Amino acid sequence: MASLSRALRVAAAHPRQSPTRGMGPCNLSSAAGPTAEKSVPYQRTLKEGQGTSVVAQGPSRPLPSTANVVVIGGGSLGCQTLYHLAKLGMSGAVLLERERLTSGTTWHTAGLLWQLRPSDVEVELLAHTRRVVSRELEEETGLHTGWIQNGGLFIASNRQRLDEYKRLMSLGKAYGVESHVLSPAETKTLYPLMNVDDLYGTLYVPHDGTMDPAGTCTTLARAASARGAQVIENCPVTGIRVWTDDFGVRRVAGVETQHGSIQTPCVVNCAGVWASAVGRMAGVKVPLVAMHHAYVVTERIEGIQNMPNVRDHDASVYLRLQGDALSVGGYEANPIFWEEVSDKFAFGLFDLDWEVFTQHIEGAINRVPVLEKTGIKSTVCGPESFTPDHKPLMGEAPELRGFFLGCGFNSAGMMLGGGCGQELAHWIIHGRPEKDMHGYDIRRFHHSLTDHPRWIRERSHESYAKNYSVVFPHDEPLAGRNMRRDPLHEELLGQGCVFQERHGWERPGWFHPRGPAPVLEYDYYGAYGSRAHEDYAYRRLLADEYTFAFPPHHDTIKKECLACRGAAAVFDMSYFGKFYLVGLDARKAADWLFSADVSRPPGSTVYTCMLNHRGGTESDLTVSRLAPSHQASPLAPAFEGDGYYLAMGGAVAQHNWSHITTVLQDQKSQCQLIDSSEDLGMISIQGPASRAILQEVLDADLSNEAFPFSTHKLLRAAGHLVRAMRLSFVGELGWELHIPKASCVPVYRAVMAAGAKHGLINAGYRAIDSLSIEKGYRHWHADLRPDDSPLEAGLAFTCKLKSPVPFLGREALEQQRAAGLRRRLVCFTMEDKVPMFGLEAIWRNGQVVGHVRRADFGFAIDKTIAYGYIHDPSGGPVSLDFVKSGDYALERMGVTYGAQAHLKSPFDPNNKRVKGIY
């Protein structure tokens, strides 16, 4: 028997080889040293699995010839998806597992469930998983899933970590999740074996717990089978059949296996680390990597029984209660990649690399000192799949209709499985999930990145290594940068631009007055023999963001904002998505796609939403009507019929493209969608002086009469043809210039030269965030999401409900309007100058009625501004009188601050400034 202290000595005496080198699977009898004994809960299954593969014995039951949906993979996600499909009434659902249920990754997972995460959607998903495993499955089947409610304890060794936990506690109040911030002394009383000398405090969540993966998956399979679903084990999938319809759309046709084929229109890829291989069978890109992920199980520890599970984030270690012992694991900076994923791997394990694992042992011994003299009963090192942003991959693949993803769960497949299985089932049956799943949707990644090996590897490494880091609101990745750069990148970098990354693009964040801060090649934080960058200016500036207070450059952002309000600012918005929708059916398609009336004369520009069939908002964007053109140019493609120019936030361009494409396919529209995002740049000149500046650059009259708001024209700027639009995302007089790529730099320089005497300065997206919330403009996927309707969000003016023209989502909006709104988006301001970022609880008359979706500081009104949806605790409609009559407060990190509710933006509520009235 090895002890944890001996393991530390072994690791020190035997340095390991390159961390990137893949290691082959081992069976129970082949391990040496501390890994000789692996008495994990599935030892019998493992030993049985070392003989002849069960696959050779044939499938566990005959294959049906047809199915309505085939789920590939019998792990947590596969079983949860099958169960929820059956529960929602889907007939003909089949699950294919190449070995036995839980093989591959699920069988060796720790099975932890924490109820609080820094995401409102994830809190909801976790709550559903907990309901399923702790109550619903047992009620349905009479079987125990192995759920144990022993509570969870998050450890804070510094002030910022404790602040993060207080944020989680405030969010939990909006969802009824009980949690308590404990002092070190209170923590010691709860967990007597814990060292609390270095603690600032802890967050205790009494209803957290653990799940048994084998028990849960077996029970899910039985419950699904009772509802008519089929589970077929020992049946590897060897291919995906695809057909192309009359409109050139690729669709799923069937599944091939070693034992026959199944005709089906729908496949769900829940294959874990093998998901990329399954994707390749269908020509679908699945951006994930496989890594070794490990934990050790200790011998018996006196006094550990009934203790809560522990996450010591600052030590990057977790301690899971396992009877009268502990499982110890975590996330390291130098994880081992599994370079060549074997399709023979089922219930095997890797040898544990003690040098890699040492840091977790050190952290565990520091937190629970008795572990230093405690023996190691077993080690478990198996494969897990990880993704570029540490979020799962879900939804319909943009390359293939009927091919859904449910993979890449970053070692959280058990805890997220119930919620995600339910949402995936809705996605398959109804075309969309019920919740806002954009953060998990495969369409959140641009298609140019999802098969880019360096980007996938770098980002997956960084997200793994930072998994236990504090989640700060304005953090940025260092990995996978400079993938997409617009024509102004070098120009702005030289002027001190500090860039953010969105959708692969480098976009301006803010401008540092002390010179360039370029993003350098990823250094893996010094792991794998890489040399960490020294004197890295960008990393230093990013470190200033690691706070829940105002950052040091708060005043720099203030300067950018007030320059825009008082004179003028230029924003490089080239990362925007820019599409053309043209063709004979383009007007019919536009009427159906867009909630607003966009059938205005050429030269008009309309702000609109795109909705789903439930009336939820899939996008907000501008749509500009084009005049027919017989000669193509970057600013106007040649087309017959009708044409529209679409511009939307670049971070969601792929989502928009996929949504529009799917709707056009479903409607069988005869029109063309053209992506010109890479061909055009875009700068926005905003502020009271913008007209005077641009009048020197553009060859046209810019008066209100000659160039009204919400119109566009093809003009020349410093001799270059551009599309000028009179629009504003910040609530000021201003114009956007959409510019062919080759003309961006000369046009930008001409604007800056003309603006020098007017006080024109560069500004970035941190300023846009502040200016736009101050004006009351919405940001998609912040205060406007696929589960929010325009009526709830105060955007009824974007919906052509007074016209007879049908549009996608109209029926749902009409039903919602007739029934009364059950929640509304409300603007709040506070006199206390404290930063808020979202997730803060909203109190009304002493009751929690929601949480903040988005918040920032408004420099013109000199107040913190927050937006959040509120509901009536009694369950009734939320009227305007309900909003106005309440006494409000916002809870930030456990402290409440009085707040004033507004029905309109407190800044320029009559919209005079965008009209040029100052």
UniProtKB/Swiss-Prot annotation:
Q: Name one GO molecular function term.
A: sarcosine dehydrogenase activity
Residues with Phosphotyrosine modification: 777
Question: Which domain of life does the UniProt lineage start with?
Answer: Eukaryota
GO terms for biological process, alphabetical: sarcosine catabolic process
Q: Top-level EC class, please?
A: oxidoreductase
Q: Name positions with the PTM N6-acetyllysine.
A: 173, 559, 775, 802, 884, 904
Q: Where, subcellularly, is it found?
A: Mitochondrion matrix
So, what pathway does this thing act in?
Amine and polyamine degradation; sarcosine degradation; formaldehyde and glycine from sarcosine: step 1/1
Q: Which UniProt keywords apply?
A: Acetylation, Disease variant, FAD, Flavoprotein, Mitochondrion, Oxidoreductase, Phosphoprotein, Transit peptide
Q: Kindly state which reaction or reactions the protein catalyses.
A: (6S)-5,6,7,8-tetrahydrofolyl-(gamma-L-Glu)(n) + sarcosine + oxidized [electron-transfer flavoprotein] + H(+) = (6R)-5,10-methylenetetrahydrofolyl-(gamma-L-Glu)(n) + reduced [electron-transfer flavoprotein] + glycine
At which residues is N6-succinyllysine found? 38, 173, 377, 391, 802, 884, 904
Q: What PANTHER family does UniProt report for this protein, alphabetically?
A: AMINOMETHYLTRANSFERASE, SARCOSINE DEHYDROGENASE
Record's family?
Belongs to the GcvT family.
**Function, as annotated:** Catalyzes the last step of the oxidative degradation of choline to glycine. Converts sarcosine into glycine.
Q: What is this protein called?
A: Sarcosine dehydrogenase, mitochondrial
Ranked from the top, the taxonomy reads: Eukaryota, Metazoa, Chordata, Craniata, Vertebrata
